[in-house]
Amino acid sequence: MAALHTVIPVWLLTDIRRLVVTFAVALASGWGFLQIGIPAPYLMGSLFGVWIGGSLVKPLQPHLGVARWFHKPVVLGLGVLIGATFNQSVLDQAEKWSLTLVTMVVTTIIVTSIGYQFLRRFRGYDPRLAILCSVPGGQAEAIAMAREMVDRDYVVALFHLVRVVFVFVSTPLLLRLIEGQEAVNQSNIALQTMPSIADLPAMDIITFILLGVVGMLIARRLRIPMPHLIGPVGLSTLCHLMGWADLPRVNEFVILAQLAIGGAVGARLAKVPFGELLGYLKDACANTAVILTAYLLATVIIAKATGISFLAAWLAFVPGGLYEVTLLALVFGFDVAFVAFHHTVRVMLIFLSLPALALWLGGGSDGPSDKSSDKSGDRSSDKSSGSPPRG
């Protein structure tokens, strides 16, 4: 073992040990969630499994965490996959959806503004934490972005988890309970039947890597905020719109991304006293109520104005996860491209504008800290337990 230490730095061995333990717990929990039909099972399962496991088994806590050097390549890949959802066939139909698209964008801006003002002025949140908690959509991407911008990324995770739970409870009820569960099951089947990396041509794998790395380098050169996310998103979008690339979602990477993001946040949550989380839970529920009420009103208005089915418009508007909501649309016979396009535009709108907006807003104790020198993604977690918001 001593010889191994002379070859591999101690910090790297520690990071690898944490990764192995975290991924073992995350994978087991995710597989369990998959078996009982939970939506986004590997994301939800890894988050809850690592969180609860670390909270109940205190000696496990020092061995949980996902290092930043592992986390950033995952974000690169996520950026490429977000950009890949924009292709020419979707763009060809965008013109006839202009009214619903504008309504959705305006609703998103209004909802985010209301949520931000509530959390900032009445609950005392720091500006960046408030804006990250207020954005309606893109759970995995929001959590990944929060880790780069604030210390208390577990608060952002809690807000988005509450919203997703509300959506997955309310939407199947609106679309009939049995069919809703069928859609969740199909969503999980779709994850399992995505193409494997072993089935991809070598050129697709090379393209995937190049879009991520080159996109990040271009964004760094242009001094764009969060270059490892925004760069791959921008370059991937351009290449897919121009027809230069056509990348599928790869089963192994999608699962890996869910495990890495969910496991990282779960490890942070495990070290935060439960009493502190309760202080944020009330705010998360209030924020979710505002989001869903606003989108519900927008859905009613647009359905009456255009004659579009209420349920089709609701699926296009409700921020409950692009892939899961798209599969709900497929099960119930709605226009899948219509639903997917609106969700994709909202996610793109949020994550192309949010880094610049968050930097402009600035922040206090949850503002940016120079973590670039951190070799372990778990070292900053000691400062994550700030005081809960006001009252």
Model-derived segments and spans:
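Small-residue-rich segments of transmembrane alpha-helices in multi-pass membrane proteins
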Residues: 72-84, 107-108, 131-143, 164-170, ...
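Juxtamembrane and boundary regions of transmembrane helices in multi-pass small-molecule transporters
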Residues: 116-125, 167-188, 222, 300-305, ...
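Alpha-helical membrane segments and immediately flanking helix-loop junctions
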Residues: 122-162, 310-343
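Helix-loop-helix hairpins and the membrane-proximal interhelical loops
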Residues: 68-69, 73-111, 120-122, 193, ...
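Cytoplasmic-side transmembrane-helix entry/capping segments in multi-pass membrane proteins
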Residues: 45, 65-78, 98-100, 124-135, ...
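Long hydrophobic alpha-helical segments that form multi-pass transmembrane helix bundles
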Residues: 164-209, 216
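Structural signature of multi-pass alpha-helical membrane transport proteins
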Residues: 2-70, 80-90, 111, 197-273, ...
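Membrane-embedded alpha-helical segments of transport systems
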Residues: 136-142, 156-179, 294, 322-324, ...
